[in-house]
Structure formats: structure tokens, C-alpha cells
Amino acid sequence: MGNCCGTPATAEEGGKRRRRGKQKKANPFTVAYNRAPSSAGAAAGRPGLMVLRDPTGRDLGARYELGGELGRGEFGITYLCTEAETGDRYACKSISKRKLRTPVDVEDVRREVEIMRHMPSHPNIVSLRAAYEDEDNVHLVMELCEGGELFDRIVARGHYTERAAAAVTRTIVEVVQMCHRHGVMHRDLKPENFLYANKKDSSPLKAIDFGLSVFFRPGERFTEIVGSPYYMAPEVLKRHYGPEVDVWSAGVILYILLCGVPPFWAETEQGVAQAIIRSVVDFKREPWPRVSEPAKDLVKRMLDPNPMTRLTAEQVLEHPWLHDSKKMPDIPLGDAVRARLQQFAAMNKLKKKALKVIAEHLSAEEAADIKDMFDKMDVSKNGQLTFEDFKAGIRKLGNQMPDSDLKILMDAADIDKNGILDYQEFVAVSIHVRKIGNDEHIQKAFSYFDQNKSGYIEIEELREALVDEIDGNDEDIINSIIRDVDTDKDGKISYDEFAVMMKAGTDWRKASRQYSRQRFSNLSLKLQKDGSISDDTQ
């Protein structure tokens, strides 16, 4: 239910988890959603509302001093917090009771505190120091984690060796094992919910954010769709699941650690859901041919679509790949992680070719606008843009990318790799950044590829269209494009699939953070109605 990391978060990111909690299915034993708030869940912070059953106290200031803001969300603010007597530093998440508008909001906070108190001390689970409640706020004093997210270390490091991936996976699964032994299902395991205690390489990894966690009894099944889409088990979409979902999510994280992208990826929520239901794991693209067979075997067993035969946390920890992790290869698996987390760089050659086609069909006004921008950036008036020229121009477009991302973007646009952008290279990247491509442009680009007018881009048409883009018509690249874009896996690309590719980016991390729980819940119902997923309970 919150991030106790010392790295500031945006309001959008900080508030996302709480918004999800507001949309949970109503408990039949509590007040229904469509009724006016009762005293148990007073909407506007009504005086007398008590959220916690057993708060540490009422006066936070008597023992702790709040410092600078670490993060802000819809329901509250996380501050640096210092214990007056010892000088020890913590994170304090102050949740405004005025913003707990429904009984479900109140129950979310209450349950998170109870779960964190219930869990025994563990080196890889963030600890709750104290929980105060006054007239206006609930204050959760927690262990301060200043080492950043697991995800960010993946990106910064650029790749993981198998040995490093095994060490991280062992930690994550040990957390799952501890939760399950104490009757807690996390339900939202993902790289963002694991923080490092400090910035040292030897820093312990800590599980955080128990806001979607729930107590469970052996054999109990749940129906509420929660979690983040790329880490969601198929039985969650089928609305019949138990603690096995945490092992699935840990398996998704392992897959990402080894190759840099989620195993079930698409550019639409429906595509993601369908990929999860199909549960076909790709071990063909790089760097998988270089990954050991024991590692791939563990991924397969953790991503078993049948929860009844999926490995338990205990079985995962006994798997040879983890049991003998120090014997695993310590050779880097390449730069796949960085390469695949880069939006424009990860854009496949089909999309780049399509952007060129669109550029040729721009209206005079659109073309003039881009030419004018290029001329303004080209301060030396030599028809070429340096990185500094490009950076200044992108800022003028209103895109505040960090320099590191801009460098990646420019490198991807710089087709001839001479370190500068000419006008044609600039046109393609401008269309991407400014999202100029409209439906008419996309239709023209699709028609360019669909030479036989069948309504599909077929493999032969793809080969012919990209003959100038690919040295020797590399079959691996052709097959990779089909795998990436062909979401219904019929071996060809429909207009809808092509349009989705053109309109969306490939930044799956951002998509994960912008996830709408209600939309995914509605999507589950839609897929059940159209027969994409069955109502079986396995």
C-alpha cells in the first residue's frame, strides 16, 4: 500500500495502488458500494472514524520528527522520519483519513497494517515500526529503504548473469515461502515492489507494499482480480485462485531477470490477457539460447498454467538451479535488458519502415512543420543534428526525457550510425515522438505492405518490404517481428494488429504502472463471454 523507498515517486505512481484498492468487489458482510458511507467508512474524514484496531498511539510527534517528502500519492504523503531519542531514520507514510471515502478504503489500510504486524521479522521483508492514528491521519512508520527498486537496478546494470538472477530469485521465493507459511498471499509481486535497503551491491532486497495482500486459509479460493497485468496468473483472470499466483508472479520476475521483457507481452490489455491465458513461453529469442537448461526448466515449472501442478515455493527453492546457484554460469547474458526496455530502440524494423512510409505521405502542412523544427534545431545550418541539437529540440516538443533516454532514442534513429541525424532520420523520430501518425496515415502504410490486398501482411510480403532494411533478409528478424506484432498468433499481421503497433509504444514498464484494475476486471468478463477463457476452475 505504499513505497518506503527514499526515491521520490510521482503522484500518479504513488496513488495508483490506492486507487486499485478503491475498486475492490464489495464484501457482502459490509456496506455496499452504492450506499452512502456509513460511520464505519465515513467518507469525508468524519470525526470519530477509527481506522486501526490497535494503534501504537495518537501523537506521532511525541516520538518522531517528520523531515522531507519522499513520495506523494492520492491518499497521503511519505516523509523521511527521525526518531527523536535515537536519531534512527525511517519512512513515515501519512494517510489522510479525509481521503478514505469508502469502507473498502478503510479496510485496505487496516488489513495492510494487520498483515505487516502479523508477519515475523524477516531480513527480506520491510518492517513496520509503529502505526499511529490521530484525528486526521494514519501514520505508518516503516523501515527506510534507500537503495531503489529491483527494476531500476536491472536497467542500470543492463544485464544479469544467471548466478545473479538465481540469487535474486531465491530471495523473492523465500519471501513467498514466508508469506504462505503465515497464511498471507501477496498478490502483487513485481520488480517495483522489491526495494534495496541501501545502495551497496551487498544490500539486502526487501519486499514492500502489502496493500493488495490478503489472509487465506488452506484450500480457500479468491475471485477478485488484483495485481499487475504482466505478472498476473491465468487463474486470476478466471476468477478462481489461491496462493499459487505468487509463484507465477515470481516466475515472471525470473523471466525478466534473464532476458529483460515479460514472457506475456502485448501492446493492448486484451492482448496481454490472451497471452497469459495461452501461457506460451518464448525461449527462442536472445539471450535464451545461451541460458542454461536448468534455468529454463525452472521458468517453465513456475509458469505452469495449471496451479495444481505448478511448483510450490518450497519446491522452487529445492530446484537444482536455485539449490546449486553458486555453480550457475557467471557470464553476462548480453545487453538484452537495456535493449528491450528502450522504447524507440525496441521498435521493430517493420514499424521503422512504416514510419518512413508515413513520412512520405505527410500533408504539406505536417511536412513543413517538421522541416521548420529541423531547421530551428540545425543551429550550424549544415543539414545535420548533433546530440545537443537534438536534445534541445526534443525539449521544445514538450518531451522531458532524461538525457540517457534521449541518447538511446537518437542512437536508434541514427540509422547510418555516424553520430548525427540527417533530415530523413529526423522525420521518422519526430513522427514517433509527436505521434503524428493518424488512422489515414496508418492505413496507407498498411496498404504499402499488404501488396496482394488480402487484408493481412503475410510473411512473404514482410520479407519483400524489408529487403532493404535487413541484411540478407535475416529470418530471425522476420520471425521476431511476427512474434511481436501478431497477437492472435495466426502467422500474419492484421490491420488492427498493425495499428496497435503503430499507436502504442513498447515501454512495458510504463504500461504496467498505468494499469487500471477495473479495466482488467471488465476485460476478464469480456473474454469469458466471448469464449477466449473458460469458466473452469481447474
Curated annotation (Swiss-Prot):
The gene is CPK8. Belongs to the protein kinase superfamily. Ser/Thr protein kinase family. CDPK subfamily. GO terms for cellular component: cytoplasm; nucleus; plasma membrane. This is Calcium-dependent protein kinase 8. A lipid is attached at residue 2 (N-myristoyl glycine). Ca(2+) 2 binds at residues 414, 416, 418, 425. ATP binds at residues 70-78, 93. Its main location: membrane. One of its GO terms (molecular function) is calmodulin binding. Ca(2+) 3 binds at residues 450, 452, 454, 456, 461. It comes from Oryza sativa subsp. japonica (Rice). Activated by calcium. Autophosphorylation may play an important role in the regulation of the kinase activity. Ca(2+) 1 binds at residues 378, 380, 382, 384, 389. It catalyses: L-seryl-[protein] + ATP = O-phospho-L-seryl-[protein] + ADP + H(+); L-threonyl-[protein] + ATP = O-phospho-L-threonyl-[protein] + ADP + H(+). Ca(2+) 4 binds at residues 486, 488, 490, 492, 497. Its EC number is 2.7.11.1. Residues 64-322 form the Protein kinase domain. Induction: By UV-C. There are 3 contiguous domains conserved in the CDPK subfamily: a kinase domain, an autoinhibitory (junction) domain and a calmodulin-like domain. The autoinhibitory domain (328-358) inactivates kinase activity under calcium-free conditions. Residues 1-26 are annotated as: Disordered. May play a role in signal transduction pathways that involve calcium as a second messenger. The active site is at residue 188. InterPro entries: CDPK_Ser/Thr_kinases, EF-hand-dom_pair, EF_Hand_1_Ca_BS, EF_hand_dom, Kinase-like_dom_sf, Prot_kinase_dom, Protein_kinase_ATP_BS, Ser/Thr_kinase_AS. It is found in: Membrane. Residues 328-358 are annotated as: Autoinhibitory domain. Residues 365-400, 401-436, 437-472, 473-508 form the EF-hand domain. Residues 16-25 have a biased composition (Basic residues).
